[in-house]
C-alpha cells in the first residue's frame, strides 16, 4: 500500500535527520512574507479556487505523518507562465498560466501531485538545510527577492544536476517577474536535484493511480509546459523547472503518453483563459492574447467578450482588408451572442474598425446607436466612476460624429 510504504520511508527519514522544528518555524515566517507579496498578483475567483482546492484536497497525502504541523492550502496567482510550486510551509501556488496551458483535470492533478511529492518527501527543507550549512542565516535570507545568485550552496550536493541554473529576469509581466524569479523560488528550497524530481514524480504516479487519476497526466502536462516555452522560444532560465532539458528528462522517466484533454476541465477554466488573454492584451502581448482566445473559440467556449478581445488584438497586429473583414464578422458574431443585452464594447470597437476601413457613413450610424445606449445607461442613475466613464464616452462619440461630418 502506498500509504504504508511512504509512512515507513518518512519514519526512517525523520528518525535519521530529525524534524528541525526551529528551522521549519523560521522557514514558515519567510514563506508567509513571500505569500504576502504574492497577494499583489492574487487571482480572485472563488469558483476556480474551490475547484483547484478540491483536487488538491483529494490528493493530500500528508496525514501519514502527524508530526508535520504545516497547514496545507492553495493560492492561485495571475501569471502567463505555467507555474506550480509548493512552498515548504505547505502552501501550493498555481498560476493562471498553468490552468490555461493544460487541457484536463488529470494533467492538473498530475502537476499538483508532483509538487505535493516534493513536500511530502521534505525536499524543500532538506535543500534549505543543505544550503544553510554554508551560509549564515542572516545573509542567506537577506536578499530572497534579489535577482542575483548570491546564496552559497553545497556544490557536492548538486552534483547530479547537469547545470546550475543561470539567473536572469524572465520575460514576464510587471511585478510577476520578480516575484516568481529563479532566486526567489530557489531560496525557498525549490531548486530540486534531478534525483528529487524523479523520486517525486514516481511518488506522484502512485498517488494519482491510488486516487483515481490517470498517471499519464504527468507526461502529458510536462509536454504541454514544454510546448509553452518552445512557443515562446525559451529553453532555459525557466522559474521552477530550470530548463526544457530538465522537463524532457522527467518525461523520459515518466514515460511517453498521448496528449490528454477533457471538456469538463476546458469548460471550467475557460474564464481563466479569457482573463489571461485580457492580461496579455493590457501588456501589449497581442499574439499571446489571440492564441489564448482562439483556444476558447476552438473549444466552442468563447463569449462575446472573447471575440471583442480577439478583434482588439488582431487590429493591433495587422491592418489588411482580409483581417478587417474578419474582425467585422467577429464583432457581428459577438453582437449575436450578446442578444438582448447590448455590449457597449462591441459598438465602440465596431466604430473604430469601420473608421479604419473608411466606412464613415456606417460608423456614423453605429455612433448614433452608441450614444442612445450610453444615454439610456446614464438614465439608470449611475454614479461615480461609471457616470464619469459614460459622460466621457458620450463626449467622444459626439466628437467623432462631428469629425465625420467634416470629412
PLM region descriptions:
Residues 180:
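His/Cys-centered metal/cofactor-coordination and adjacent catalytic loops
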Amino acid at each position: 500500500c502506498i500509504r504504508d510504504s511512504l509512512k515507513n520511508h518518512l519514519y526512517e527519514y525523520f528518525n535519521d535527520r530529525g524534524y528541525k522544528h526551529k528551522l521549519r518555524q523560521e522557514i514558515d515566517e519567510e514563506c508567509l512574507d513571500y505569500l504576502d507579496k504574492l497577494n499583489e498578483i492574487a487571482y480572485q475567483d472563488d469558483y476556480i479556487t474551490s475547484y483547484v482546492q478540491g483536487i488538491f484536497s483529494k490528493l493530500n497525502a500528508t496525514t501519514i505523518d502527524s508530526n508535520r504541523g504545516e497547514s496545507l492550502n492553495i493560492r492561485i496567482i495571475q501569471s502567463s507562465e505555467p507555474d506550480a510550486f509548493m512552498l515548504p510551509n505547505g502552501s501550493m501556488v498555481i498560476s493562471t498560466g498553468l490552468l490555461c496551458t493544460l487541457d484536463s483535470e488529470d494533467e492538473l492533478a498530475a502537476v499538483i501531485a508532483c509538487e505535493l511529492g516534493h513536500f511530502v518527501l521534505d525536499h524543500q527543507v532538506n535543500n534549505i538545510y543543505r544550503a544553510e550549512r554554508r551560509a549564515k542565516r542572516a545573509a542567506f535570507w537577506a536578499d530572497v527577492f534579489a535577482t542575483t545568485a548570491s546564496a552559497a550552496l553545497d556544490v557536492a550536493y548538486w552534483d547530479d544536476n547537469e547545470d546550475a541554473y543561470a539567473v536572469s529576469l524572465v520575460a514576464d509581466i510587471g511585478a510577476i517577474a520578480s516575484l516568481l524569479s529563479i532566486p526567489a523560488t530557489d531560496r525557498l528550497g525549490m531548486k530540486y536535484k534531478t534525483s528529487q524530481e524523479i523520486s517525486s514524480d514516481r511518488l506522484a504516479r502512485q498517488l494519482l493511480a491510488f486516487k483515481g487519476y490517470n498517471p499519464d497526466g504527468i507526461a502529458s502536462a510536462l509536454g504541454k509546459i514544454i510546448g509553452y516555452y518552445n512557443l515562446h522560444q525559451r529553453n532555459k532560465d525557466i522559474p521552477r523547472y530550470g530548463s526544457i532539458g530538465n522537463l524532457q528528462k522527467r518525461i523520459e522517466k515518466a514515460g511517453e503518453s498521448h496528449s490528454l484533454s477533457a471538456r469538463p476541465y476546458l469548460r471550467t477554466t475557460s474564464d481563466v483563459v479569457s482573463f489571461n488573454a485580457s492580461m496579455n492584451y493590457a501588456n501589449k502581448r497581442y499574439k499571446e492574447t489571440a492564441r489564448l482566445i482562439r483556444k476558447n473559440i476552438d473549444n466552442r467556449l468563447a463569449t462575446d467578450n472573447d471575440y471583442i478581445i480577439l478583434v482588439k488584438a488582431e487590429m493591433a497586429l495587422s491592418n489588411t482588408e482580409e483581417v478587417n473583414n474578419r474582425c467585422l464578422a467577429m464583432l457581428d458574431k459577438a453582437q449575436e451572442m450578446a442578444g438582448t443585452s447590448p455590449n457597449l464594447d462591441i459598438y465602440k470597437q465596431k466604430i473604430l474598425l469601420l473608421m479604419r476601413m473608411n466606412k464613415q457613413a456606417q460608423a456614423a450610424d453605429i455612433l448614433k446607436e452608441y450614444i442612445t445606449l450610453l444615454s439610456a445607461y446614464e438614465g439608470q442613475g449611475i454614479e461615480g466612476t461609471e457616470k464619469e466613464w459614460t459622460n466621457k464616452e458620450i463626449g467622444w462619440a459626439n466628437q467623432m460624429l462631428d469629425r465625420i461630418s467634416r470629412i
